[in-house]
Amino acid sequence: MESTASIVNVVRITYRLPEVKILFNKYLFLFITSSTLIVIDQYTKFMVTLHIPINYSIKVVEGFFNFTHIRNSGVAFGIFSNQNSELKPYLLIFVSIIAIIAILVIFHQTGKNKKIVQTGLVLVFSGAIGNLIDRVLHKEVIDFIDFFIDNQHWPAFNIADSCITIGVMFMIADMFVGDGSSKVSDNTLMK
């Protein structure tokens, strides 16, 4: 009886190995990609802090693109930056942590065939962590990428913001075009 039970356990474990490998690869992708993007984000912010005084610009492309050291105590596009409260930085840190947890839960629940969504979530996760690090260290986010035409400036942003924006674009793209997995299953059902 014991040998039969151990064979059944080996079969169960062997059956689950592909699932474990897929899950491992999914989280390995999250770890490697997000670690790389977070390091790049923090390195660029460190270099800006080291070499560009606050509210000072370095021209990169005349009349179009500068590196401008700006501190944003609010959220995207400087929203809430004029709100003065001692609790604001802590509230934004708390909201960031909740958002990061939600992203991880959604990432975990995302199917193995939803590579576009997984990539989008990894990008958003990376950006959220990058900006959270700023909020914890500085109580504000360091922005420096400044595009403009004449005196019309797009709000300054950073690598983390770019990750969030591109990640959201990936998820929206998946809603419209998908990655083909649902189309394959629909065609299979029709046959």
Residue ranges and their predicted role:
Residues 2-191:
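Alpha-helical transmembrane bundles and membrane-interface segments of multipass inner-membrane proteins
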